[in-house]
């Protein structure tokens, strides 16, 4: 599917024609990864999605949403914005019931057209209200002022709570793992996959935690397996806090892209009965130690609301804040 639209004022060179193309994995995947890598190398931050995060959306999140929950695939509602030479200059990427964008420097004016498209084409991803409307959610970095202005102009309202982009530089760290007797930080290569997946699930769904890690979780195992299809999987790893009796306390997964020398840590989960003991901090220090051995320069983690404090305690610094903007349409 293609659209052609006129965008005004692109790069201060007057009007420009923009091609809008629905994402086709076979045709566009490599192009998108290249675009995201180039954007990161130029910006050196998470204003543009990391390539690993895009893979996580394809191979884990979409499997969870579609195959396990029966919802629409995000990938089916992803759009490329191309210039008249068919170079990607922007992406519309839904993540569940949210609208996200990645835009090349100099093309900031396409955000309005992206919103036009999103408000029309992404509707099936949102639950309908009784009156047939949807609560459309836009995710925008606070550092991108023109997006805030456009959202306010359109009547969007900003939530009080928001997200945080957090970064740490493994090559500058020198961590020693410090845990109480009977606990240890380990990597996940030799542990049972069902137990790891179930422990992660229990961290997000404490009411399901009956203490038994040997049972298949209610959801998440298909997406756990799906992640293995990512091109980044071979260089990626898990970090956990484990009791001597084999019980798993905390779990996280770390995607690694050697080309950009970045890591993306997602998900991070601590079971409720093991919280407030500093286990997430030590688990993430284990991640930093391995990334340092690998020579990775920057490690990123996204956090919502109060969870940012967990990552700050583990040595991460917040490099940008992210707001959630709502409008009923």
Give each language-model segment a name.
Residues 2-13, 95-183, 189, 323-328:
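Acyl-donor-binding surface of acyltransferase catalytic domains
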Residues 136-139, 265, 298-303:
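Conserved hydrophobic beta-strand within the GNAT/NAT acetyltransferase core sheet
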Residues 108-124, 270, 276-289, 293, ...:
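Conserved acetyl-CoA-binding loop-helix of GNAT-fold acetyltransferases
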Residues 90, 160-163, 250, 320:
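A structural microfeature
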Residues 210-211, 220-225, 232-244, 248-257:
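Phosphate-binding active sites in nucleotide-utilizing proteins
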């Amino acid at each position: 599917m293609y659209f052609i639209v006129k965008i005004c004022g692109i790069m201060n060179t007057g009007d420009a024609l923009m091609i809008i193309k629905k994402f086709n994995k076979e045709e566009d995947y490599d192009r998108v990864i290249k675009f995201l890598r180039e954007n990161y190398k130029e910006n050196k931050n998470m204003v543009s999605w990391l390539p690993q995060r895009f893979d996580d959306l394809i191979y884990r999140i979409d499997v969870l949403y579609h195959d396990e929950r029966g919802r629409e695939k995000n990938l089916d509602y992803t759009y490329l914005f191309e210039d008249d030479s068919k170079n990607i200059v922007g992406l519309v990427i839904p993540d569940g019931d949210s609208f996200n964008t990645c835009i090349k420097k100099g093309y900031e004016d396409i955000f309005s057209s992206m919103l036009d498209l999103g408000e029309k084409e992404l509707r099936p991803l949102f639950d309908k209200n009784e009156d047939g409307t949807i609560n459309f959610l836009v995710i925008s970095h606070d550092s991108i002022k023109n997006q805030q202005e456009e959202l306010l102009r359109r009547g969007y309202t900003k939530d009080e709570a928001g997200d945080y982009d957090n970064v740490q530089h493994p090559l500058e760290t020198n961590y020693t793992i410090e845990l109480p007797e009977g606990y240890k930080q380990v990597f996940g290569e030799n542990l049972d996959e069902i137990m790891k997946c179930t422990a992660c699930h229990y961290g997000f769904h404490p009411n399901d935690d009956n203490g038994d890690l040997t049972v298949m979780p209610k959801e998440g195992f298909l997406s756990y397996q799906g992640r293995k299809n990512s091109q980044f999987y071979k260089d990626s790893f898990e970090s956990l806090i484990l009791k001597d009796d084999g019980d798993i306390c905390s779990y996280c997964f770390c995607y690694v892209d050697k080309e950009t020398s970045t890591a993306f840590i997602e998900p991070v989960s601590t079971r409720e009965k093991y919280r407030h003991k500093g286990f997430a901090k030590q688990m993430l220090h284990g991640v930093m130690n391995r990334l340092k051995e690998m020579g990775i320069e920057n490690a990123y983690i996204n956090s919502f609301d109060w969870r940012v404090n967990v990552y700050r305690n583990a040595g991460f610094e917040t490099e940008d804040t992210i707001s959630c903007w709502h409008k009923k349409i």
